């Protein structure tokens, strides 16, 4: 009899795998299911994407309880682990450790916390201040999260924003080492350069002290094999499903508005039957046959 591997264990194994692993952004239950069907072994619960699909800015305008509600639907809709983009932890150590417990309750496999101040500013904003948290305070926040988890395989990823904030390699390395020593299961090293030079410098200096996660949204032209050669553990494709859906909705809506007709869009969009399939409507039909009276 085979034993199903817990989602938390799956994520931990991915972070510590010798192979380069990939996880894909999702922002609701439907997109989570699509990501799984595509073959991805894990899901990134993007803060930007979850905020955007709620119609608010990526500045903690959506409360942590609203985000967790979305993540519950995503977890229910998929069998692969979800790593939540948990921003700064929605406050101090106490908010962050409470978040961890609530994520565990909902079957989320891990949380990624960034070392900036609450409320956060999206890392890809140009010309916006990116104040960093005190190193010791953030390291203790990581420790509080690790101490509060009940599942030993629940993963805490510490996201270092030193390069984003304009600091150099020494600061990035100092922060990464502090967070690793505090118990972080992996370090996410972020950069918004159009080339991977920040990541290259960090990986060389880091010297395989622990798993490293990257988000190549800005340096997307870099061949994936280069990340393998550097020793990166995991790549996050961070917001592309949300961006693709916005493009599709804009085009479809404009076409219908201009044409006052559905003729030119019907063959470009999925059928209602496909939506039913993604919702696993067949399971409900079978359940109705089994549990509803026949007359």
UniProtKB/Swiss-Prot annotation:
Q: Which CDD domains match?
A: ICL_PEPM (cd00377)
What are the recorded GO MF terms, alphabetically? metal ion binding; phosphoenolpyruvate mutase activity
Q: Which EC number applies?
A: 5.4.2.9
Which positions in this protein are listed as binding Mg(2+)? 58
Instruction: Using the record for this protein, list the coiled-coil segments as residue ranges, or answer none.
Output: none
Q: Which GO terms describe its biological process?
A: organic phosphonate biosynthetic process
Please, which domain of life does this record's source organism belong to? Eukaryota
Q: What is the effect of changing residue 85 to A?
A: Strongly reduces enzyme activity and increases KM
Pfam families from the UniProt entry: PEP_mutase
Keywords, A to Z?
Answer: Isomerase, Magnesium, Metal-binding
Write down the InterPro entries for this protein, in alphabetical order.
ICL/PEPM, PEnolPyrv_PMutase_core, Pyrv/PenolPyrv_kinase-like_dom, Pyrv_kinase-like_dom_sf
Family classification: Belongs to the isocitrate lyase/PEP mutase superfamily. PEP mutase family.
Question: What role does this protein play?
Answer: Formation of a carbon-phosphorus bond by converting phosphoenolpyruvate (PEP) to phosphonopyruvate (P-Pyr).
According to UniProt, the name of this protein is Phosphoenolpyruvate phosphomutase
Per the UniProt entry, what species is this protein from, by scientific name?
Mytilus edulis (Blue mussel)
